[in-house]
Design a protein with these regions (language model features):
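Compositionally biased, low-structure terminal segments
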Residues: 8, 60, 69, 73, ...
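Acidic, proline/glycine-rich low-complexity IDRs
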Residues: 1, 109, 113-152
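Low-complexity, serine/threonine/proline-enriched polar segments
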Residues: 24-118
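Short, extreme N-terminal segment that most often corresponds to the first beta-strand
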Residues: 1-38, 142-152
Length: 152
């Protein structure tokens, strides 16, 4: 199983990986972009992902934290300076490849996580489609505060 998780916030924030609520059967989800922060409503839940009280993704297996802790922290530091505007620019591919080369982690939102036909799309289009009813975020700057690519 392979998955991407991209954490997005309206402000820079510290985020800890919480692996306490994972279930081995939660394997149907292949990609999600997740807003964190109480000020942003989450309109839907995705199978296989639990959202904690602070809005962060809760992983399923405890071994993910120990195995990816250093990679997660390195990626978080790298992504914390990148803005929403940078990720929806024409440089998205170059940014992704640079991160992949340095950290071995992809930053790719994947459409329709419950569908078998996955394809990469820009962060901009993912957010616009997922949050198209939330006009108040149209001019908001978002920060990538963490990104994880993992296998099990």
């Amino acid at each position: 199983m392979h998955n991407y998780i991209l954490f997005i916030s309206t402000e820079k924030t510290d985020l800890k990986i919480n692996t306490s609520c994972m279930c081995p059967n939660d394997i149907g989800m292949h990609g999600i972009a997740d807003y964190i922060g109480n000020e942003i409503p989450i309109p839907m839940s995705v199978a296989g992902v639990k959202v904690s009280e602070n809005g962060s993704v809760v992983f399923v297996r405890s071994d993910i934290e120990s195995y990816f802790k250093k990679r997660f922290n390195d990626m978080k530091e790298k992504c914390s300076v990148l803005t929403f505007k940078q990720f929806c620019s024409t440089d998205l591919y170059d940014i992704r490849k640079a991160i992949e080369v340095h950290y071995g982690i992809y930053v790719v939102p994947v459409t329709d996580p419950l569908n078998e036909n996955y394809y990469a799309e820009t962060l901009d289009s993912f957010l616009r489609e997922t949050y198209k009813y939330f006009d108040e975020y149209e001019q908001q700057t978002f920060y990538i505060v963490a990104a994880v690519d993992y296998h099990w």
